[in-house]
Amino acid sequence: LFPIGTLYDPFIARGLDALNYACYQDARFMVVATPSGISLAPEGGAHQSISTPMIGMGQPGLTSFEPSFGDEVAAIMGWSFDHMQAKDGGSIYMRLSTKPLIQLVRDLSDADKSDIVSGGYWLREPGDDCKMVIAYCGAMAPEAIAAWEKLSEDHPGLGLLAVTSTDRLYNEWQDLE
């Protein structure tokens, strides 16, 4: 049995002592936070979560994700329950949006799911003549897709990178050095 909790994303800092202690004690849990990002909080600047991604990236024992689409959430949750049970696993911090997004209609392969939980995948693969890539995370997907559609004619080979976990991408990049 693993606890799954929800919270208002900007207020995760209020529980940092407990979060740090739980992660260092190897507690296993999933925390789901909304709303993520700076463009989503109708309450105004005092309630925007611009520093919370760093909490997810910086806390040992906690893996953070910020998916855009429902099928990404499903892939991440499937991986997360295995990760929470693994001897070398840990806890999960998932940042979600309250912004309505039109969902993609697609069947994810095992390779697609692996890319999603690894931190990112090409929503539009770059061509051989790629000189530019648009990367997005979370609720900014519609704006990034619209930008790709607008720019792809003038920029052949333009890629569109969906980042589902800055945490996992950064840590894997660090492991390469």
Give residue ranges: language-model regions.
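A broadly tuned preference for mixed-charge, low-complexity surface segments
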Residues: 54-62, 151
